Design a protein with these regions (language model features):
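Sec-dependent bacterial lipoprotein signal peptides
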Residues: 1-15
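Well-ordered beta-strand positions in beta-sheet-rich domains
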Residues: 26, 34-36, 122-124
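Bacterial Sec signal peptide processing site at the extreme N-terminus
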Residues: 16-33
Length: 171
């Protein structure tokens, strides 16, 4: 995956707590959620801005999970939050998307094609709203490899379990 694509992944996120952990293929966030890591081929990218960033070399692609826990963010419309995840793309074309329910919570999905630094890419963004937290999921890949990773991304997002049992302080 190109550096600009990773920049897009990082540019849309707020810094979070660093007390997350991975056990037996499950990522646990101190912000009250957990997700299963995708199947073979994806590796954790350490030191990213998101709580969990994953990358795949062949075919190239990246995905992330992150959460923002504050009343202001949680009060924004899902359409705005979802669009925010793909800011920075040029020549954006919304191919698919709309409201859905994930883990019993309202969510929004958008599949977008566009370009980043002149290179064509595909992106799929999913935002899930909890009571106080907003959970962001993003998958980005070069246009030629985009469809290859979408099944892994779908499985990753659908594994979401929200707990929100933290006591304040999470951002």
């Amino acid at each position: 995956m190109t550096k600009p694509a990773w920049a897009l992944l990082g540019a849309v996120l707020l810094t979070g707590c660093s007390a997350s952990r991975i056990e037996n293929g499950v990522f646990y966030s101190p912000k009250g959620y957990q997700v299963n890591l995708p199947r073979q081929g994806w590796a954790v990218k350490p030191g990213g801005a998101a709580e969990l960033e994953l990358q795949r070399q062949d075919p190239a692609g990246g995905m992330l999970a992150d959460a923002t826990c504050d009343d202001k963010t949680a009060g924004r419309p899902l359409t705005v939050l979802t669009r925010h995840l793909t800011f920075g793309l040029k020549d954006r074309v919304l191919e698919d998307g709309g409201p859905l329910t994930l883990a019993g919570r309202p969510a929004q999905r958008a599949v977008v094609r566009g370009s980043l630094d002149g290179a064509p890419i595909g992106a799929e963004a999913v935002v899930i709203k909890g009571e106080r937290c907003v959970y962001d999921f993003l998958y980005v890949a070069p246009a030629a490899a985009f469809e290859t990773g979408r099944g892994d991304f779908r499985t990753f997002v659908e594994s979401f379990v929200g707990v929100e049992s933290f006591s304040g302080g999470a951002r």
